Curated annotation (Swiss-Prot):
Keywords: Amino-acid biosynthesis, Arginine biosynthesis, Cytoplasm, Transferase. This is Ornithine carbamoyltransferase. L-ornithine binds at N99, D163, S167, M168. The keyword Transferase applies. Reversibly catalyzes the transfer of the carbamoyl group from carbamoyl phosphate (CP) to the N(epsilon) atom of ornithine (ORN) to produce L-citrulline. The record marks E79 as: Important for structural integrity. Its main location: cytoplasm. GO terms for biological process: arginine biosynthetic process via ornithine; citrulline biosynthetic process; L-arginine biosynthetic process. It comes from Neisseria flava.
Amino acid sequence: DQGAGVTYLEPSASQIGHKESIKDTARVLGRMYDGIEYRGFGQDVVEELAKYAGVPVFNGLTNEFHPTQMFADALTMREHSGKPLNQTAFAYVGDARYNMANSLLVLGAKLGMDVRIGAPKTLWPSENIVARARAVAEETGGKILLTENAEEAVKGADFIHTDVWVSMGEPKEAWQERIDLLKDYRVTPELMAASGNPQVKFMHCLPAFHNRETKVGEWIYETFGLNGVEVT
């Protein structure tokens, strides 16, 4: 829309990390372009690209973090909370091991927000990421709560976030395990009401399994009897 020249390199069109080192790819692309956005799996890949490209490198998503989504989420919460971010509370409920929960934890800590993670302990963010976030929160005045109680996590929250329970590339067999672990962490009208905040708002980075209007959604309904998974 802004008139920039854009090239999309799909996985099959690049030999990055396979037949060509990440360092060499970074150096070549850095001579051809003014910026690079990487959307893939390895956090180490985007960090190595940034080290050697010589131009700005943007993390569009990795397994560990999703910072560009955080710009959108911070703006949305600021626009719809009616108060400064450092006076805003939000909860993330669900599988908290991956990029969305990690990024929301770091975002909230940096902005001095009241952050709650509601998940089974086996699905909490890594101790390293939690420790880093707590250290930042001590400087910004932020608050961090990790709990296995979904209702405790959402109490008093202005926003409730969640994400998919099974990510792209994971086998179908993962669904049964996640449903067993996370069935008490679905975002439902009852969980929203448990916030005690009549103005609480729901956020999801999408795509969301919230009904039967997709092939996967219909399969989940036929297999597990659920009309919607992480949110309904």
